[in-house]
Amino acid sequence: MSKSYSYLFSGTKGSITHDKSVIEKVSRGKLKAWAKDKMASLTGKAKSSFNTACIVYDESTGKCYYGRNGGYKENGYTKNPLLFGDDTHDGILPKSPLNKFPVGNCAEVDAVNKALNAGAKLKDLHLTTIHVTKRAFGEYKASCENCKYTFKGRVKENYSGWVDN
């Protein structure tokens, strides 16, 4: 992808805002643009299975991180131990799926994982998740049961909401 999506506000490297209405509006717009570019860069099964995208805004740095469903399957993916655990500690993801999707498959997990690997703290993160299917492109998509278990009460905000159980 040729465009830069690193910061929420282009041309203002490191600009930070705490205004939730601004974050929500700008995040969603950037996410839609990123998702279109990402879709255009994918082929085969990766393209046909891409149905969800997430942007994570770190309010402490102004940086953005993007994720897609199935992103953890990409080559070179580094699983953050806070999420996935390690040899000595369990991660905060559920041990087994709370729905029909594999634990760690979600766009939210992909984006948050990237943010954590860059040094972000969960308490500073704002999440926005959208559908990227032709039928519902750009519409908000509530975070699933696995993500609700993992992130609700730990992240600053989720503009797409949480699935109802």
Short names for language-model regions:
Residues 4-165:
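Zinc-dependent deaminase catalytic domain
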